[in-house]
């Protein structure tokens, strides 16, 4: 066997082994790619993304190292209280996101940036959400589940949910801009809460302006009366002065003829 044949006989198996290792790295996630406390499994159905399950893992925050090819992310039943802006940016394949049974209290404008084109289901039920930014769900095509939260029904919530086609009859108003709507379903709020807030602001401005106007009028009245009182006292003082006696040869009227 020539040296060339010997080299080829050894190099070809090595090349095949190297190719196999590369394919395994590309096609199957290694243990280091899965967030701590979670399990990752490759989906058998197209597009063969990852199913990442972090349920009941006592997480206090959303893992920042979720693999970019994740298509299902289960974060339910943890202690997550905050959804940072752009935390899911880069998860372009994510279809289902489960954040139910956590301690989230509010949602900012950029909480779900990057999921507009892929997300199909977003579950936020059984949290502590009272308020959201009016654009928190903007451009999302997903079915958003937000029931069983202590909502404060205001203009921002009406703007956030009003343009969505999904039914929110189970969203109850724990508190509301309208007192008679407290404890009622959000869908039963017929009033325009945004116009209500605007009218409330207008009324406050009118009351403030009326108060200032009343103060100015009161000052003017006080100033005029004070001047009248000073003038009256001055006139009484002048009247109290003794008159100058006339001289015998002084005429009654003095006229000047030009």
UniProtKB/Swiss-Prot annotation:
Domain LRRCT positions: 149-196
Membrane spanning stretches: 204-224
Compartment(s): Membrane
Record key words, sorted: Glycoprotein, Leucine-rich repeat, Membrane, Repeat, Signal, Transmembrane, Transmembrane helix
CC annotations in GO: extracellular matrix; extracellular space; membrane
Glycosylation sites: 51, 98
Membrane topology term: Single-pass membrane protein
Cleavable signal peptide: 1-33
Record domain LRRNT: where: 34-68
Name of a matching Pfam family: LRR_1
Per-repeat ranges for LRR: 69-90, 93-114, 118-139
Tagged with keyword Zinc: no
Family per record: Belongs to the LRRC3 family.
PANTHER family: PROTEIN TOLL-RELATED, TOLL-LIKE RECEPTOR
Protein's UniProt name: Leucine-rich repeat-containing protein 3B
Species in which this protein is naturally found: Danio rerio (Zebrafish)
